[in-house]
């Protein structure tokens, strides 16, 4: 699934980076592929997005006017025409493979052509501060449910049901795991290192959250305290509530971290407290951009104005991300089990020209 021509150059580049560069914390590169088949025999829509950490850097949409891979980050725009040609061909091949897989999966599950169906894939790699592989993954889902996943050993598969076992047997016979493992341990890590170097001003920054607590009366006896964290990057953050110094785990409303639309993120955590006891509750915030964790209380005399415009913008971006990529929310969960892997044969799987950061095109289901 990868073009070998530039591999020697990339190996030299990644080796140099490994010797000269270290990165704070771990980093990840992930691709999300989604194929949606409409009812009947219409052509499936295929959408692909790529992320380094929490930053989208590439997108492809088979329904777009310009069906090419599109840069979504300044640091990837510097890649030349050959890079974008390879990216585009990768996505087009994957779209063709997923079209076949959707047809086969309908047969495996004995489904008619009346309904709409979705086939998803998420794959990628994580590296540590030393730039070495920490973890690789390749997970597939059908209609929002786990289908098959590469195990943590990168040598074997876990099938979610009897239909997925059909795919598992095909992939084991094709020795597909071995080739995917070679990609995850090799080119995936190499290109992630390259992106981290090229985009270090963006990808390795740490923007601390802007925080405050708001008070919302419910009745004469209760009120909601909401702890806000806005404008932070990267997305990983921890918000907790304590009562008299003891962490509260029950009845906490915690929203998922949301994109703000400007490259940063938003999050809040809320809980209902007895009126008059608000000062017994503290919100605790931990984030990479903070020198030390923050502790906040509601200050009755200085209720801040909630930045509704920014929050609405964040929700709008979230909606676009969800509907445009239809990807992460229902991706399969990882499983682990033992087993033997192998190397993918051309006869069983699409074997693309290899290059840049493109993964092996997934075998047909």
From Swiss-Prot:
PROSITE patterns for this protein: IG_LIKE (PS50835), IG_MHC (PS00290)
- Which Gene Ontology terms cover its molecular function? peptide antigen binding; signaling receptor binding
**Stretch list, region Connecting peptide:** 299-308
- Residues of the signal peptide: 1-24
Specify where the region named Alpha-1 lies, as residue ranges.
Answer: 25-114
Mark the residues carrying the PTM Phosphoserine: 356, 359
Q: Please give the start and end residues of each transmembrane region.
A: 309-332
Membrane topology value: Single-pass type I membrane protein
> Which cysteines form disulfides?
125-188, 227-283
Q: One of this protein's GO BP terms?
A: antigen processing and presentation of endogenous peptide antigen via MHC class Ib
Is Cell membrane found in the keyword set?
no
Give ranges for the Extracellular compartment: 25-308
Residue span of region Alpha-2: 115-206
Cited SUPFAM superfamilies = Immunoglobulin (SSF48726), MHC antigen-recognition domain (SSF54452)
Q: Where is the Ig-like C1-type domain?
A: 209-297
Q: Give the region (Alpha-3) as residue ranges.
A: 207-298
What do we know about how this protein assembles, alone or with others? Heterodimer of an alpha chain and a beta chain (beta-2-microglobulin).
Q: What is this protein called?
A: Class I histocompatibility antigen, Gogo-C*0101/C*0102 alpha chain
């Amino acid at each position: 699934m990868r073009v070998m021509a530039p591999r020697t150059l990339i190996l030299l580049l990644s080796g140099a980076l490994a010797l000269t560069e270290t990165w704070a914390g771990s980093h990840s590169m992930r691709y999300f592929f989604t194929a949606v088949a409409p009812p009947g025999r219409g052509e499936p829509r295929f959408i692909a997005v790529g992320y380094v950490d929490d930053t989208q850097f590439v997108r492809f949409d088979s329904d777009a006017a310009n069906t090419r891979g599109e840069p979504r980050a300044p640091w990837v725009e510097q890649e030349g025409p050959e890079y974008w040609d390879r990216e585009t061909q990768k996505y087009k091949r994957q779209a063709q493979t997923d079209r076949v897989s959707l047809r086969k999966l309908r047969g495996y599950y004995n489904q008619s052509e009346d309904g709409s169906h979705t086939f998803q894939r998420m794959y990628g790699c994580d590296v540590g501060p030393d730039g070495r592989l920490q973890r690789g993954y390749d997970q597939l889902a059908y209609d929002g449910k786990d289908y098959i996943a590469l195990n943590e050993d990168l040598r074997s598969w876990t099938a979610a049901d009897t239909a997925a076992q059909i795919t598992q047997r095909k992939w084991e016979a094709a020795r597909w795991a071995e080739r995917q493992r070679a990609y995850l341990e090799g080119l995936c890590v190499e290109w992630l290192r390259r992106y981290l170097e090229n985009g270090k001003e963006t990808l390795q920054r740490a923007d601390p959250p802007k925080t405050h607590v708001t008070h919302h009366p419910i009745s004469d006896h209760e009120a909601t305290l909401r702890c806000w964290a806005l404008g932070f990057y990267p997305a990983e953050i921890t918000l907790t509530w304590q009562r008299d110094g003891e962490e509260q785990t029950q009845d906490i409303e915690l929203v998922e971290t949301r994109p703000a639309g400007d490259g940063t993120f938003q999050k809040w955590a809320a809980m209902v407290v007895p009126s008059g006891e608000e000062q017994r509750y503290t919100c605790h915030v931990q984030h990479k951009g903070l020198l030390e964790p923050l502790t906040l209380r509601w200050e009755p005399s200085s209720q801040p104005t909630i930045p509704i415009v920014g929050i609405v913008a964040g929700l709008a971006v979230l909606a676009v991300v969800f509907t445009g990529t239809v990807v992460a929310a229902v991706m399969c969960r990882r499983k682990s089990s033992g087993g033997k892997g192998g190397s993918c044969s051309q006869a069983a799987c699409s074997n693309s020209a290899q290059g840049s950061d493109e993964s092996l095109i997934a075998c047909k289901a």
